[in-house]
Amino acid sequence: TALVGEDNAEAAFEKLSSMVTGDVYGEDAVKAYANGGGAYFCGFTNSLATLTFDGETSTISGTDKDGNVLFSHAYHYIGMEPVRGLYEFESDDADSGEFTYFFLAPDTSAETYHIEFRYGSDAEALSQYDVGEYAYWLASGISTDCDQTMIDNCIELFCTENLAG
């Protein structure tokens, strides 16, 4: 309530919730939001539960909720996505399916307490945010070794960025 005051707290909650609590993405979201509005789905897709980034080997790997490895590939930088300034990476493995491309926001756990990213098999479609198979989807994650302070800082930053001024 420090940012918006007690009288505006409920409206602020509704605004913030409506931005990131979408439960559809892709063509389903395009249809659902055809008359306006729209909330981003910020979860993981394709059974992904945990991501690991290894900077030493330029490898990104992912596991499902049971710890089973879904993929593990080396990636190389291919450019910058112009709409949101995401760093674009492509797998060195030609058979990477929906994990062929990773587009990573410049967020870091040290500075923003979370990361934002997209992944998929079509780089052009990943560059579009309100059309196509990845519409209204931007995954967000927090470190698996986070503590309560990091969680609180992440929430505070989200509120400040989206409610201030």
Q: Which residues fall in each region the model found?
A:
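Short, solvent-exposed loop/hinge segments that bridge or flank secondary-structure elements
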Residues: 1-57, 95-108
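Calycin-type beta-barrel ligand-binding domains and close structural analogs
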Residues: 42-165
